[in-house]
Amino acid sequence: MKADILQHKLVPEHTILSEEEAQKVLDDLNVRLDQIPKILPTDPVVKAIDAKVGDILKITRKSETAGIFVAYRVVRD
């Protein structure tokens, strides 16, 4: 029996951005793709959501101090 890691309370929501959404994030943050922090293709959540190398993930987590915190990661080695 496998556990669904996406349902664990400590795993924040991960969303794969479309190409249009990814370009908007890069433009809004005024950064290049290689300036976005990485997440490895071997990460369990990356595997669970079937993200591919080059995808940008939006990670949304709840924070007691910030309310909701959004981070972006690009899948790469």
Curated annotation (Swiss-Prot):
<keyword id="KW-0548">Nucleotidyltransferase</keyword>
<dbReference type="GO" id="GO:0006362">
    <property type="term" value="P:transcription elongation by RNA polymerase I"/>
</dbReference>
<keyword id="KW-0808">Transferase</keyword>
<protein>
    <recommendedName>
        <fullName>DNA-directed RNA polymerase subunit Rpo5</fullName>
        <ecNumber>2.7.7.6</ecNumber>
    </recommendedName>
</protein>
<keyword id="KW-0804">Transcription</keyword>
<dbReference type="GO" id="GO:0006366">
    <property type="term" value="P:transcription by RNA polymerase II"/>
</dbReference>
<dbReference type="Pfam" id="PF01191">
    <property type="entry name" value="RNA_pol_Rpb5_C"/>
</dbReference>
<dbReference type="GO" id="GO:0005737">
    <property type="term" value="C:cytoplasm"/>
</dbReference>
<dbReference type="InterPro" id="IPR035913">
    <property type="entry name" value="RPB5-like_sf"/>
</dbReference>
<dbReference type="GO" id="GO:0003677">
    <property type="term" value="F:DNA binding"/>
</dbReference>
<dbReference type="GO" id="GO:0003899">
    <property type="term" value="F:DNA-directed RNA polymerase activity"/>
</dbReference>
<keyword id="KW-0963">Cytoplasm</keyword>
<dbReference type="GO" id="GO:0042797">
    <property type="term" value="P:tRNA transcription by RNA polymerase III"/>
</dbReference>
<comment type="subunit">
    <text>Part of the RNA polymerase complex.</text>
</comment>
<dbReference type="GO" id="GO:0000428">
    <property type="term" value="C:DNA-directed RNA polymerase complex"/>
</dbReference>
<dbReference type="InterPro" id="IPR014381">
    <property type="entry name" value="Arch_Rpo5/euc_Rpb5"/>
</dbReference>
<keyword id="KW-0240">DNA-directed RNA polymerase</keyword>
<comment type="function">
    <text>DNA-dependent RNA polymerase (RNAP) catalyzes the transcription of DNA into RNA using the four ribonucleoside triphosphates as substrates.</text>
</comment>
<comment type="similarity">
    <text>Belongs to the archaeal Rpo5/eukaryotic RPB5 RNA polymerase subunit family.</text>
</comment>
<dbReference type="InterPro" id="IPR000783">
    <property type="entry name" value="RNA_pol_subH/Rpb5_C"/>
</dbReference>
